Every structure is written in C-alpha cells, then in structure tokens.
Amino acid sequence: MESELEALAPRPASPAEPPFQALVEAAGGRGQVLLVGELWEREQSRALLRDFAGAVFPPESAPGKPGCAEAESAGTAAATESHGAPGAKAERAIRSPLVFVLCRVGSLTSRESRRRLREMLRDVRDRRCEGAALVGVLVADTGADDARAPELQLLETLLRTVFGRQVGGPVQAAAFRPGCPASSLAVQEAACRALQAAGPGRPEGAWERPARTGLLTCFSWGPRRQRKNRGVTSSQGPAQEHLQFSEEELALTPVFPNGDCEDRGNGSRAQDGGVHIPPDPPEDTR
C-alpha cells in the first residue's frame, strides 16, 4: 500500500525547466521565439540553429495536437506576416518577445570578427521592439571545456556596448555547449531572468500568439553589400570584392520555419536554415 501511495505522489520537477516553459508560454509560446545566428557556411549555420533549438526547446509530443505539416504551414504564415522582406522600418521590426542571438567563440577572437558581431547586435537592437527579452549565447565547440569565462565576459562586454544598462536585466548572456545538458539549463535560466526583467516594461497586448504553431522563427544574419552608388544594392557576392559594408544598410536575412528564405527584392530563394519544433502541450538603451 505504501509503495502504491509513493507511486501516486507527485515527483519534484526540474528546477529550471518548468519556470522557463511557463515564462515562454506567458510570452506567447515557443512559436514567438526568435533565433538569430551568424551566417558563415550555410549548412553549418543551419545545424547550429537546429542543435540549439533542439537542446533548449526539446521536442514534446501530445495527443490531439496538429501534425508537423499542419503546424509548419501555420508557422510559415505567421513568420511571413511578422518578418517580411527587408525594407521599411516597420516591416523589419522584430516583434518576438524573446530573442536568442547566437555567436561562436571564434567571433570574439579578432577585432574584425568582433566588429561584425557588434554590427549584428546593433541591427537586432534597432529592430527589436520595446519590452522584448534578449539572450546573447556564446556557442562553444563540442567537447570543449565547460568553463568559457573569458569568452563569456567578452560577450557581456560587447552586449554592454550595444545595449547599455539593459545588460543584467532584459538582456542576458549565457554559454551553450552542444551535447551538454547543463549548458542548456544555463541558457534557459538566462532566458528566465531576461523575461522576468522585461515583464514590467512590456506593453500590454504587445505579443499575440500565432494560432496552432510550435515553430521557432530563425534568422541567419549576413550584412548586405552595397555598391558605391548607394541607389543600387548588389547580390553578386564574389564578383563585387570592392564593395564595402554600410552599417545603415545592414539587414537580417529572413529564414522562415519551413527552411525557405525569400528575398522579395530580387525574387531569389535560398535555403539558409530553419528549425521545426513540435507543438507545445495542454543608450541608455544603446
């Protein structure tokens, strides 16, 4: 009898995961979360976003929920509405209540790579809506030591130069190592702190949950190249080596949850990355 009662007794849950899930749900659900990652090599960039999403937002199955295809269709429609092609400021606005910005350790090792990362963060800052939480994530190599304190401090310093006094509040930093569950919990805890700090300043009704979607929207970030003639934007790549980066013209490349990325400016399509997550169960701002 005692053993039966013990079996029926509620078991303590993980200390980090339930608050994280509850806060994400309160902010609109995982379908409202945005991942931003560097674009250096297409498949590797995709794999990084996919691995991170799978570790921090583990798949959960629930009976009676919409299937993958149905959820993917709903998620694509929501992403298309909210994250249209780069253009006017309103069209480029990031309306997600929780944003993860992923960077590799190698992006902090040289002045040029830090400059690129700073430009990415500034672009996200300028597009991010008031009251949103943001977590800068340092991605360590698989098999690396858990301790990445020097690099994490560099990331925090970089975040502080861009977001100012928001760092430590709605802007947090964490280290993530693929294959290390403890690092996934650290990222979740950082997201909890950011969401809790952003909560009081969040405009009422700012976030609306898309219907029946369990998809995360992802961006692979790459600066737009521009001709010396500011009226023309080039997409030729290697043939335009004389072009310079213009901070005012930087833009996030939208990647929809089904993996399709459409640049409405030139009609081309690319597969820069996308992550499918199954549905949930019942300065001085500078």
From Swiss-Prot:
InterPro entries (alphabetical): C2orf72-like_C
Entries under Pfam families matching the protein: DUF4630 (PF15443)
Residue ranges, compositional bias (Low complexity): 69-85
Ranges where the record places region Disordered: 59-89, 225-286
Cystine pairings recorded for this chain: none
Domain of life: Eukaryota
The protein's name in its UniProt record: Uncharacterized protein C2orf72 homolog
Gene source species: Mus musculus
